[in-house]
Each structure stands twice: as C-alpha cells, then as structure tokens.
Swiss-Prot record:
This is Fused uL13/uS9 ribosomal subunit protein. Residues 259-282 are annotated as: Disordered. It comes from the Archaea. CDD domains: Ribosomal_L13. L13 is part of the 50S ribosomal subunit. S9 is part of the 30S ribosomal subunit. Residues 150-282 are annotated as: Small ribosomal subunit protein uS9. Residues 1-141 are annotated as: Large ribosomal subunit protein uL13. SUPFAM superfamilies: Ribosomal protein L13, Ribosomal protein S5 domain 2-like. It comes from Methanothermobacter thermautotrophicus (strain ATCC 29096 / DSM 1053 / JCM 10044 / NBRC 100330 / Delta H) (Methanobacterium thermoautotrophicum). L13 protein is one of the early assembly proteins of the 50S ribosomal subunit, although it is not seen to bind rRNA by itself. It is important during the early stages of 50S assembly. Keywords: Ribonucleoprotein, Ribosomal protein. GO terms for biological process: maturation of SSU-rRNA from tricistronic rRNA transcript (SSU-rRNA, 5.8S rRNA, LSU-rRNA); translation.
Amino acid sequence: MLLMIINGEGHILGRLASVVSKKLLEGEEVIVLNAEKILITGSKEWAYGKYKQRIDRASISNPRRMGPKYPRRPDDIFRRTVRGMLPYKKSKGREAFKGLKAYVGIPREFKDEEMVEIPDAKAGSIKKGMELGEISELLGARLQIGSVIMKKVIHTSGKRKTAIARGTIREGKGRVRINKVPVELYTPELARLKIMEPLKLAGDVINDVDINVRVVGGGIVGQAEAARMVIARGLVDWTSDMDLKEKFVQYDRTMLVGDPRRSEPKKYGGRGARARRQKSYR
C-alpha cells in the first residue's frame, strides 16, 4: 500500500481535502502534517462564524442532547472535512477514511521523512484567509505546538427580547465584568442577582476563569438574562461538563436555550393586548 506524507503548510483546506479524498479512495494511506497551518479562504468573521455555528448546533427543544458533535482541533477539523468528501455511510468510504492521519506540527517520528506538497492545492497569494490553528484558538481548543501553547478562549452569545450579549471566557482569577463593570458592583441588585445565578451553580469552576460580557439593547431585565445566558453557555463550553449543563437545565432551561416569550404590547380598541371592547345590542 502506497504511503503519502503531505506538509499541510500553505495549502487551502478544500483543495487539499479533495486531493486527499481521491488518494484514499484509490487505496493509498495519507499522512498530513502541520494541520494547524492549513488555510481557510475568506474573511475571519465568516470563517469563525461558520465553525462556531457547527459547534453550537444542537436540539433547541432538548438541550440535554449531546449531538451533533463537531471538532475544535485543526487536525480533527481537517479529518472531518475529508470525511465529508468520502461516501462515509458506505463501507468503501469508511475503509478509505481509516487510511488518513493528521497531526498538529511535525511529530518526532516524521522529522526525517520526506514530505510532499500538492501544487494544485497551494494557496498562492490569497487576500483573505486564516489558518486552522487560529480558528481552533477562537473555538476554544488548547493545543501544544512545539514549545508554544495556544491559550483556550471561549466566545459565546445570548439574547433576550431585544437585548444582545456577547462574552469571552479565558483563563484567569475569577473576575467577571459586565460592560466593564465588576459583577459585584453591577446595578440594580435585581439584575446582579439574576446574572450571578450560573456563577453560584458552577461553584469553584469560576475561580479559574475571567469572563467579560458586553450587552446592548433592551431593558434592565432583558440585559440581565442575556448576560446570564452568555455566562452559562460559556461555562458549559469551557468545562465540557454534562453534569454542569444538566444542573443549569434543571434550575432554569432558559439559561442555555433562550426564552422567546415577551409581553405583547397593548393595541387600540381594547383594555389590553388581546382584549377588545364588547358591543352590546341589548
């Protein structure tokens, strides 16, 4: 069986995955190194949004469901991309997929091996793009490449009525800020207590992270619930702890899945949103 070792640095993800999938179907074994340096063309905002949406995809009606799963690491993202180009639901595709291996960096056993490049898959001079390693860092993956450790960062968002919140969670000392204000000083008290609910449920987990939340629009309670959702979702993503997720759901499922309900405005011709003045013919 033929073996091909490819240096993924400077290759475009889709083009390289297309070539690799064809080689696998022909019965070859393929090893891809430097997976974190494979490029995705397009703007950073688009690329991050695309993969974040895949990771966040879940059943809204049943948040305790564990799938579908999508990888965060660059080597696993590449493998998943190749898998999508194979007839994976058939035995032929599954057997071919077993011949693919991808690595972050260059492992010691491949230091002295001859690596090839795929000219048709090289990036050339693209104007917009980012490496899989950058995507993985934004998605929260923690990788060690040589002596460099990619720091784990989690980005989350939440919404309640017209309030929209976005937050970032990274390693820290338990500092939580809402619109640059420490949560302990956030006013009014009703909103502060609402925001701190997931922090109290999470327990000691909060001592090892810093959380920054930016919330705009809506009213006091709407902003508080949007910020609460950002914190709860972020802690679940950070810990990957299904017990913590279950705890949030049991306490209040709207921490994770949102609440579309809102007060319907009053309209003319009646005492309320739906009530109408009744006309009597007697």
